[in-house]
């Protein structure tokens, strides 16, 4: 009998974008590749390609989805009633975290201190964040604890650094931090956890912490009130750390974040009594850098998803990527993402040494701005995919839920902006170094020149206003404008970097839209004359 072929048009799949994976996320990111070379990290290109291919693999996508679906479970007691405080984690979480540790993202600059060490790590951090943002929290804290210990507790650093920076996932150690309490949030002065001397250099901590991310960490830096005031302590996970519950969070659901009670926990002092904030701030500055890098990563991944979809999807008889309105949106996303990437790598390079004033100031400025821009960009990118981007099989819902976190972690928007204002007054060398970096592009674009002039005037007014009143007398007015002051500084650095290093089409579009006042408030309102085709082709080469 002859076989009759039956065609079922209902089941035929047409006009759908093919899977993005497998993809080498580093190979298709020209902005990151160029920035890595420029910032001294050319020696790490092979590592970045390997990480980019692994993060862009079908396996990474599978493990990320599984880790998000099978959320951590806290077991406070065993079957007999003994306190155990263990967190059950899906094997896919371990696959993702192991991938970050074995690539050295948690400590490579400390293992290999050389020029470009931090840019190489930043590139690897950006790429592996594409696999899963949740695992990057313990990775970031472990990286950040080392400089804090080296500076304020060198004897502890000597004991723990080999494990904190080692590449063996099973034998290594992870670090966390616990500052926030339920009554205080970002206001560490409100901390009520007590630290009482217990002899021979030990203290006992009693109190609670409202947020403690990643309870399986081996060690933690904890803030508590000692006899001489707020102090920083080194705590090894063990008896007395009683985890109460895991947070039911909007995003990073693969990451275990907890509430913990401290009941006679043994701890060692880091730094001096009463100097807790200066001791822990070195850790905070490095995790703030990772907030910046992580947000740049989310922006890039969302932009790639939008570009890939638009390149393969047609509507009204024409590919989306060829339609003028969509092309405007995609080009706008691309320039915003590239600006975030180049800023993240430039700031990361300052951590290699020799630029302490620029490093501290630029970290605060760019952490505020890039983390603030990420959620809106991701939302716009999701819209490019339409309904396909709104379903959980897409990568977009996960990126969207995770996007707001970095703007909250290590100080929300107002905290970050006010930190910049304080730095302008207390550490003016930081502002000077920051503006000097921006002015390396002076004379190259009239819009940037005008913007820099305004930024100089605005920041000068923070110190002494036109009416001659002092900083304290003008405190309300200055704080009221805090976000705009910091925004102008951030845009100045991004524009300067693009004018100096990006193709003319990218730099011109950015300066026109972000500095020249020629664009609207929504993405996709770039002015006429922008070379969108060139920008899009650069953002995701065919």
Describe each PLM feature range.
Residues 1-114:
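Extended, charge-enriched "interface" segments that sit outside catalytic cores
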Residues 2-37, 43, 50, 72, ...:
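Glycine-rich phosphate/cofactor-binding loops in nucleotide/flavin-utilizing enzymes
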Residues 78-172, 212-214, 337, 402, ...:
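Internal helix-loop-helix
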Residues 202, 206-241:
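A short core secondary-structure module
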Residues 240-264:
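Flexible, small-/acidic-enriched active-site or ligand-binding loops
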Residues 259-287, 304-321, 428, 451-475:
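A glycine-rich, basic-preceded beta-loop-alpha segment at the flavin cofactor/substrate interface
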Residues 338-367, 382-383, 460-480, 486, ...:
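C-terminal helix-coil-helix/basic helical segment that borders enzyme active sites and/or dimer interfaces
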Residues 437-542:
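C-terminal amphipathic alpha-helical interaction region
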